[in-house]
């Protein structure tokens, strides 16, 4: 059985475009179309797809080592993450995924995100520059405690009535976001590029 590509993802895909956003949506669609449950060959495909989208080269020996040592548990964690409605990972689970993804918390977060973008946010240097401080070093942000803190913050915000109301208003104003979870909408607000100045100052036309 194959999982369907989520409607909100499929609707936003524009194969003729070449922007980074469109490429990432296409990657999401490829991963969403993989069989359920994932088998090890699919898990390896996933981590290669994720690192094909990143500037860092995936270490195949590290992937092989993680598979050889923890294949069954790795599949359990990946399949549970793929079907989760909220983050349910333990420290051991995240450590296992980190070992599978170049010993990188950033890589593990992106693997989780592409498996289940509605639940697991991306954690990388761009996010850390906003969430922590500008110019934060990799040694400071590429660790599990920072990812847990960021993920926990987003999910705490997602349960706040004021945030829920703001996200509902955004959904109403932007039909393209219909069906997106609160976590995804918060990411949109936090990391959407600023509007050009001419659009900020433009006044509505008189009737």
Language model regions located:
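Short hydrophobic alpha-helical segments that form membrane-spanning helices or hydrophobic packing faces
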Residues: 107-113
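An N-terminal alpha-helical hairpin/helix-loop-helix interaction module that forms a charged
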Residues: 1-99, 117-207
């Amino acid at each position: 059985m194959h999982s369907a590509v989520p409607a909100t993802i499929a609707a936003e895909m524009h194969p003729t475009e070449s922007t980074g956003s469109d490429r990432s949506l296409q990657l999401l669609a490829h991963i969403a179309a993989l069989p359920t449950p994932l088998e090890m060959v699919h898990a390896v495909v996933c981590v290669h797809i994720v690192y094909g989208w990143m500037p860092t080269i995936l270490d195949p020996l590290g992937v092989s080592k993680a598979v050889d040592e923890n294949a069954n548990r790795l599949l359990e964690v990946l399949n549970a993450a793929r079907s989760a409605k909220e983050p349910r990972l333990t420290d051991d689970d995240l450590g296992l995924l980190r070992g599978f993804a170049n010993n990188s918390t950033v890589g593990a977060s992106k693997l989780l995100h592409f498996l289940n973008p509605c639940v697991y946010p991306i954690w990388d240097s761009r996010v850390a520059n906003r969430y922590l401080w500008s110019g934060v070093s990799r040694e400071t942000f590429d660790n599990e405690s920072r990812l847990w803190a960021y993920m926990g913050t987003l999910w705490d915000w997602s349960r706040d009535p004021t945030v829920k109301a703001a996200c509902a208003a955004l959904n109403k104003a932007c039909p393209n976001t219909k069906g997106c979870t609160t976590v995804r909408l918060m990411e949109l607000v936090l990391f959407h590029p600023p509007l050009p100045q001419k659009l900020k100052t433009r006044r509505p036309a008189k009737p």
